[in-house]
Amino acid sequence: MCGIVGLFLKDSRLEPQLGQLLSDMLITMTDRGPDSAGLAIYGSATEGKAKVTIQSAKPEIDFADLERDLAEAGVPARVAVKSTHAVVAIAAARLADVRAVLAAIRPDVRIMGAGDSVEIYKEVGLPKDVVARFDVRSMGGSHGIGHTRMATESAVTTLGAHPFSTGSDQCLVHNGSLSNHNNLRRELIREGIAFETQNDTEVAAAYLTAEMAKGKDLGQALTGALDDLDGFFTFVVGTKSGFGVVRDPIACKPAVMAETDRYVAFGSEYRALVNLPDIESARIWEPEPATVYFWDHQKAA
């Protein structure tokens, strides 16, 4: 059992409140998963710039002088430290370079996510503690997703926490269990995708990344997942401009959605949504089995 939440803002006036709203939603789901928690926040992008969220078990060592060491390695960057995580801002053209340099000069650092706009924060612990550790309430953005985990098939670690990201500005949270993830992992490794964990959710994230690399949009990739992924699952997925939800054909994992003129919201239970603005006038529904729900800022523009 896990708790997942998501919030896609249609009204830009709500964007400064994204971190506050999403934090409250996730904390409400604490009793569905007290082992670890995480959030992905899609903030504003800066043309020509990219950012990488990194994590370290020894931040006082790994993050010390990191800006200097990156510059000496030929990759100028700005580093903003937030507890065990840091956001490394670089020129977009240097994204592949910074990955290679980090692996060389900080081998114990792990990449949580990268792209133009996404920042990913996750740790072992209760949602309220993770939210406070990274000051999530102060963060603004256009959309975000969150997860609180009760571990069932892999270790309780920071790397095993959700969201999982395997592509630029792409991430996924999951409630359920996949039965064919080992076979699918082997196929994706042959396609060149690297994995950090044995978690089935990382396989689902990598599957979507691989499908979107073939030219599919998020909605099309989620439709393909209904045929290619076996097991029980509810996915909430984020891309740079999009937000998607899909449940398996049996839909045994709980889910509820709300939509107003100002936002679209997802929660494992309705209580995750009760404090959202104007929730009393929202359209509330349970997502149908084997049905893809997809919203995109670019298509709405």
UniProtKB/Swiss-Prot annotation:
Keywords: Glutamine amidotransferase, Transferase. Gene3D superfamilies: Glutamine Phosphoribosylpyrophosphate, subunit 1, domain 1. Its EC number is 2.4.2.-. The active site is at residue 2. InterPro entries: GATase_2_dom, Ntn_hydrolases_N. GO terms for molecular function: transferase activity. The keyword Plastid does not apply. Residues 2-298 form the Glutamine amidotransferase type-2 domain. It comes from the Bacteria. Pfam families: GATase_6 (PF13522). CDD domains: GlxB. The keyword Acyltransferase does not apply. PANTHER family: AMIDOPHOSPHORIBOSYLTRANSFERASE. This is Glutamine amidotransferase-like protein GlxB. It comes from Rhizobium meliloti (strain 1021). The lineage of its organism: Bacteria, Pseudomonadati, Pseudomonadota, Alphaproteobacteria, Hyphomicrobiales.
